[in-house]
């Protein structure tokens, strides 16, 4: 068992197509908990293509696309102006469009991508953050659907089979003084065993044991979680 504090960090995406696809792969692998297979030197095209074929297109929303067009390109501007997942800014001569790769893929607007993709200047900017927290907190956050969210998958992530050293990671509540670290039922580095924290610790140990037990008798990862 591993205990961790909540944390947040930004995933920075560059604006070229290869960067967009790489960013999507990183977000997807965070969901699949396969970040160890993420290779910054390898193209992400095939990974994203296979993800689209599997129907997991929600993660495409993390790929931010910036387009810059002349303000007389009415068809393009009208499309993105009426798209709920895009924003449009105009300074007279030029129009600055912020959208995401899912909009491009589902509407087959690849021509826009090839012709008008640009670095962000006067665009409305989008940001991606990796939030490490417990699932109860994350479910409060994802109620706000104006943003795009990808969570660690209960279906694909399997903590057994010697993956992640057979440890389930739990988040330390803000009200707890439990230190970060790796623990098990035999741990000697547990300073709170005779304190009020002991029930919390014992509950996590039992929870982790039950999770692996259910997997061992044939339950799916989703059922066990």
Language model features with spans:
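Family-specific signature for flavin-dependent thymidylate synthase
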Residues: 1-225
